[in-house]
Amino acid sequence: MASMRESDTGLWLHNKLGATDELWAPPSIASLLTAAVIDNIRLCFHGLSSAVKLKLLLGTLHLPRRTVDEMKGALMEIIQLASLDSDPWVLMVADILKSFPDTGSLNLELEEQNPNVQDILGELREKVGECEASAMLPLECQYLNKNALTTLAGPLTPPVKHFQLKRKPKSATLRAELLQKSTETAQQLKRSAGVPFHAKGRGLLRKMDTTTPLKGIPKQAPFRSPTAPSVFSPTGNRTPIPPSRTLLRKERGVKLLDISELDMVGAGREAKRRRKTLDAEVVEKPAKEETVVENATPDYAAGLVSTQKLGSLNNEPALPSTSYLPSTPSVVPASSYIPSSETPPAPSSREASRPPEEPSAPSPTLPAQFKQRAPMYNSGLSPATPTPAAPTSPLTPTTPPAVAPTTQTPPVAMVAPQTQAPAQQQPKKNLSLTREQMFAAQEMFKTANKVTRPEKALILGFMAGSRENPCQEQGDVIQIKLSEHTEDLPKADGQGSTTMLVDTVFEMNYATGQWTRFKKYKPMTNVS
């Protein structure tokens, strides 16, 4: 049992004091050296390492005087064991601490009588002598400049750099400057926000126009005369004003109609009802599913679901990344066509009052791919503002003569609207996707990472039945790249695999009306 207690104490001391990075006993050891621990140390002292013995002996100096008096016998026995040790440093420390438990003082008269101390001091003197002797500067060095000091004392040895300060990177400095500037800007904005701004009270500062009637205010409300005192006049002379703006805002929606205008309102409601019925027939879905499709339909498929969303395709410019010319929407408002039979011989009053910049919309600097189109649509030349009169027709008197070279020849422009006018009505009635086609298109576009919006519009129009080829110079078969990804395919000999670049292509045949999807495989080495 005693041997087990000794081994436990020795292991505990080694864990506490055996660290080589700390060569001095810490003051916290005083709380660990109790009477029971000192008694166990006395029994296992001979089995401890030299470093632990030294730290233990030096740790007794941190004990309070009252504790030293209580454990005087055990401490004297430990110091006696240390004085018989083979290590010279343990032996020297034991000689120094020989008088400490009795008197509380150290024995420092060892140099002359102890040969062990003489040997240790000799070794220390040799090691200190190996170091470079310190060069003492003259007293007048603080009054001399660098050149005079070098002349007097010789070249000075540069100081040894024991460590280097870690400077902050330049990005941290820039970040701090930006934060400071943003803080100053925010404070300036707060200060400027506190300044009173008259735009909030513009209803009080603006002059009232009494020449035109105010909309939505009942006739019974008292109006102020033009000669009434201002808003800031005394309250006794003021005409009563309606109490709050919210009441006026609610009353603005009220509009007084004449009896003769009731027929027009009824006709408008009837037209709205008929339009809703037509939309419901085209989509062929219940009311709940119709609202989901209306919200989820992208703008490139607007013409295939509802005729009210045609403007979104005309207003969206074609993306320049396409490898061919995307077609304009198959469904075009009828006002974009000009049959020759309906062309007026002279400009009407509505055209005469038109601003002069509208006829100059087809400028001579249009891209060449837009010039190659047959003049069927006006929306292809001016997608932002579809005009009721096509500037490509030579019969329109408002077209300037400078635009004539950029358009097609006059006979083609006159004949094309006559031949295409009946064809225009056909896609307007028949262009609609079935439920299966809509799901197939959604599934196809879900993984497509190379197709653009005009290409999606062209694919949906072809699936719905449009047979107008926008790129006739490429033939009846047009291919559109849907997606591009890589696949690891096994080699022909069955050993290993090779990485191939896979292109998913959508092919449309305008001659037969059939479409297919297939994959093209290319080795990665051929791809730049």
Swiss-Prot record:
Free-text note on domains in this protein's UniProt record: The HDAg-like domain is essential for transcriptional repression, and mediates the interaction with the RNA polymerase II complex.
Domain HDAg: 89-248
GO MF terms held by the record: chromatin binding; molecular adaptor activity
Location of the region described as NELF-C/D-binding in the Swiss-Prot/TrEMBL record: 125-188
Keywords: Nucleus, Phosphoprotein, Repressor, Transcription, Transcription regulation
Modified residues (Phosphoserine): 225, 233, 363
Alphabetical list of Pfam families matching this protein: NELF-A_N
Name of the featured protein: Negative elongation factor A
Native organism: Homo sapiens (Human)
Residue ranges with Low complexity bias: 320-341
Feature: compositional bias, Polar residues: 227-238
Region called RNAPII-binding, residue ranges: 189-248
Top-level division of the source organism's lineage: Eukaryota
GO annotations of cellular component type: cytosol; NELF complex; nuclear body; nucleoplasm; nucleus
Protein family membership: Belongs to the NELF-A family.
Oligomer status and interactors: The NELF complex is composed of NELFA, NELFB, NELFCD (isoform NELF-C or isoform NELF-D) and NELFE; NELFA and NELFCD form a stable subcomplex that binds to the N-terminus of NELFB. In vitro, the NELFA:NELFCD subcomplex binds to ssDNA and ssRNA in a sequence- and structure-dependent manner. Interacts with the RNA polymerase II complex when it is not phosphorylated by P-TEFb.
Compartments reported by the entry: Nucleus
